[in-house]
A protein has these predicted regions:
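Glycine-rich loop(s) and the adjacent beta-strand/alpha-helix scaffold that form part
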Residues: 236-307
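An anion/pyrophosphate-binding glycine-rich loop and adjacent beta-alpha core
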Residues: 278-280, 286-397
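N-terminal secretory signal peptides and thylakoid transit peptides that target proteins
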Residues: 2-20
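Conserved redox-cofactor binding core of oxidoreductases
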Residues: 140-232, 251-254, 301, 415-434
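A glycine-rich dinucleotide-binding beta-alpha-beta segment and adjacent secondary-structure elements
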Residues: 403-486
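Core beta-strand elements of the Rossmann-like FAD/NAD(P) dinucleotide-binding domain
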Residues: 51-53, 231-240
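C-terminal segment of N-terminal export signals and the immediately downstream linker at the start
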Residues: 5, 28-62, 72-74
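Glycine-rich FAD pyrophosphate-binding loop
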Residues: 74-91
Length: 487
């Protein structure tokens, strides 16, 4: 390779990571993971005899795959590595929500928007603590990313772009999703990846666990150390390494270290989200930032499958009480951030939904896919508590009985007067006054984490001093700072 070609490839490596920022944040859970045999046609064994690549990308998920494709199209030889037997990472279970201003589809629908407005909204949602440089890269590349996804065959729902109710609304309709959620993105991305593997531009290693970043005496990252699924160790050298390894929601050790309060939250991310890449980056000298900032969504059933349904799609008939027996939020609040902030202030991220007989009879239980029979099954299991009186329910729940009685009495009075003086809930359809009464325990669920590797505007990993670690980049969920305090 000539000196000029080498310089061009280094420039291409720096350019390729921008797409990874835009692809790095997707939404809520859905369908199950892809089977390992779906990728047998492109799976490659580790071959130490051919260890050289221009670029190693660790993590074949929603940031790593687009980065690999982009790099290959720029003439970079790519080694894409993942410890799973499948590709896609969280795309296999996520809702696949992506956002962008001024996409072709948005313009065709006559929706007025701009990257500047997107930036302004994202800063507001992040409580103005976002890394502004990273955020600008993301919003300025977002429309091109969405257009590219459409070009390669991603199908978006007829409603896209739309206002997403699962988080605070943007000022314009700019959220997109596919009919098969995250898998709607993964299918076409897999096809594009296979094309470049077949051309010899990308080498894919699955079931390959990266154990260490290799560095020379100056600290420059020069490659990775890998163990295959048989335990065989190999080193792979490269001009640069991009970490797209995702977050650490599945690591009990890291959660207890950085934010013990959320350690009991239900893990809904895949087991691979164990923070491996972050730990390796830290060992190589990179600073980790925002590590205490997890996104712990309220609504998971503590001890059982299922999740609460929220306004505006569902308005619960019961009330929510904390472990002190008190209401703590307007259960019908349209803004999910209002509910989440109130939830995050609760002890151990836990609370209870209180219902009565009428909610069961009317199938107004408020838990996705739960009917009367499922409620009865969970009572039998001991997860849901049932009693003929509120006083008896409080005793079974193990919370202050007198306070629970007072809370329910106050709520029932609000139904009669039509005024919720405490939280201004508007829909006061029915009192909680007909036994048996039920208590469903609710906890948080962790899908993504916002802490990770500190990076500069080129997504180069940096030390706490701000010094760049040559040869090391991070993108997607592994790179921290873009989201600020956004939930």
């Amino acid at each position: 390779m000539s000196k000029g070609e080498s310089v061009d490839r280094r420039r291409a490596i720096k350019r390729t990571v921008a797409l990874g920022v835009s692809m790095g944040t997707l939404g809520a859970m859905n369908s199950g993971p892809l089977r390992a045999n779906e990728f047998e046609s492109i799976k490659t064994a580790i071959k130490p005899s051919n260890p050289i690549a221009d670029l190693v990308i660790v993590g074949a998920g929603n940031a790593g795959i687009p980065a690999a494709i982009q790099a290959a199209d720029l003439g970079v030889r790519v080694l894409l590595v993942d410890k799973n037997p499948f590709i896609g990472g969280m795309l296999n279970i996520s809702g696949g929500h992506i956002s962008g201003a001024d996409s072709k589809l948005q313009i065709e629908k006559g929706i007025e928007d701009s990257p500047a407005l997107h930036y302004r909204d994202a800063m507001r949602m992040g409580k103005y603590s976002n890394n502004s440089e990273l955020l600008k890269i993301a919003v300025e590349n977002a429309a091109a990313m969405i257009d590219w996804l459409a070009e390669i065959g991603v199908e978006f729902t007829p409603e896209s772009p739309f206002f997403e109710d699962d988080h605070e609304h943007y000022s314009s309709a700019r959220t997109y999703m596919g009919p098969d959620y995250g898998r709607s993105l993964l299918g076409p991305l897999r096809t594009e990846l296979e094309k470049r593997i077949d051309r010899g531009d990308i080498k894919l290693l699955l079931r390959a666990k990266v154990t260490k970043l290799l560095q020379d005496d100056s600290g420059t990252v020069t490659g990775i150390a890998v163990d295959d699924d048989s335990g065989k160790a190999s080193d792979f050298m490269a001009k640069a390494v991009i970490l797209t390894t995702g977050g650490y929601g599945a690591s009990q050790v890291l959660k207890e270290k950085y934010n013990p309060k959320i350690a009991k939250s239900k893990v809904v991310c895949l087991p691979h989200a164990s923070g491996d890449g972050l730990i390796m980056a830290q060992q190589a000298g990179a600073e980790l930032i925002n590590m205490g900032h997890f996104v712990s969504f309220p609504g998971a059933i503590d001890g059982a499958r299922g999740r609460l349904m929220f306004p505006p799609k569902h308005y619960p008939q019961g009330i929510w009480v904390n472990k002190q027996g008190e209401r703590f939020v307007n259960e019908h609040a349209i803004n999910p951030d209002e509910r989440e902030r109130a939830f995050l202030a609760q002890t151990d991220f836990g609370y209870f939904m209180i219902l009565d007989k009428k909610s069961k009879i009317n199938n107004e239980i408020g838990v996705k896919d739960w009917d009367q029979q499922q409620l009865d099954r969970q009572v039998s299991s001991g997860i849901v508590k049932k009693a003929q009186s509120i006083r008896g329910l409080g005793r079974k729940m193990g919370i202050p009985v007198q306070q629970l009685v007072k809370t329910v009495t106050e709520y029932n009075r609000s139904v009669v007067t039509g005024v919720d003086e405490k939280f201004n809930r508007q829909r006061l359809d029915s009192p909680i006054d007909e036994g048996p009464f039920y208590s469903i325990p609710i906890t948080g669920s962790i899908l993504i984490s916002h802490g990770g590797v500190a990076v500069n505007h080129l997504l180069q990993a940096v030390e706490s001093s701000g010094k760049v670690i040559d040869g090391l980049y991070a993108a997607g969920e592994a790179a921290a700072g873009m989201h600020g305090a956004n939930r």
